[in-house]
């Protein structure tokens, strides 16, 4: 199986081995898989859907290799961006399902959280992330969790660096306001 090179060897696919069986059938190493799972989770994908998301990233990497295209310059960053895009897609699909459900159930009360305050900052941050627009959530996760630089995020998303900075600033401000509003921080 082909695996994109690391930052040190960034331009070639290399043969990799599966970390559990040694059979070479996994295009993502353990660290890359953990990063993909984390980006998906921080992007709001539920735990039950994380294995499917990781498989989608693997599939896209294998499809890229099979098509003969050049390996991503940084497979780990590429996989994080793909995972982030999958999280955005998951939210869009969820929104479509919810809209369909609302049409079918003419008068349905919106589901709200129980309102109980939580002392877990991580839960509050996750809820705050869910409340952000997809584009803002995406750059926030890529910058602060996937630890990508602004220029790398801009390159992977195909937007100007200024757009990434603007989205990042707006997202951080909105998340900070949400956490203060909920009296978490």
Give the residues covered by each predicted segment.
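C-terminal edge and immediately downstream basic/flexible tail or linker adjoining helix-turn-helix-like DNA-binding
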Residues: 1-18, 155-156, 172-185
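A short, charge-rich alpha-helical start-of-domain segment used by transcription regulators
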Residues: 3-41, 47-54, 62-65
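Structural recognition of an alpha-helix C-terminal capping motif at a helix-to-coil junction
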Residues: 52-59, 63, 73-85
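Arg/Lys-rich amphipathic alpha helix in sigma70-family domain 2
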Residues: 81-102, 117-118, 170
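DNA-recognition helix of helix-turn-helix
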Residues: 84, 88, 157-181
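Internal acidic/polar
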Residues: 97-122, 127, 149
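Short helix-coil-helix linker/hinge
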Residues: 119, 129-137
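A short pre-motif secondary-structure segment
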Residues: 139-143
């Amino acid at each position: 199986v082909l695996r994109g090179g690391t930052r040190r060897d960034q331009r070639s696919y290399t043969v990799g081995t599966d970390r559990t069986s040694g059979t070479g059938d996994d295009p993502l190493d353990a660290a890359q898989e953990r990063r993909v799972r984390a980006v998906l989770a921080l992007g709001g994908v539920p735990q039950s859907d994380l294995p499917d998301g990781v498989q989608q990233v693997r599939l896209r990497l294998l499809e890229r290799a099979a098509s003969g295209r050049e390996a991503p310059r940084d497979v780990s960053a590429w996989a994080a961006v793909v995972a982030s895009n999958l999280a955005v897609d998951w939210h869009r699909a969820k929104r479509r399902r919810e809209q369909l459900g609302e049409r079918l159930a003419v008068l349905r009360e919106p589901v709200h959280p129980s309102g109980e305050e939580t002392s877990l900052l991580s839960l509050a941050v996750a809820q705050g992330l869910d409340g952000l627009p997809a584009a803002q959530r995406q750059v926030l996760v890529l910058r602060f969790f996937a630890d990508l630089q602004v220029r790398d995020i801009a390159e992977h998303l195909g937007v100007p660096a200024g757009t990434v900075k603007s989205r990042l600033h707006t997202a951080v401000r909105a998340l900070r306001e949400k956490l203060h509003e909920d009296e978490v921080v």
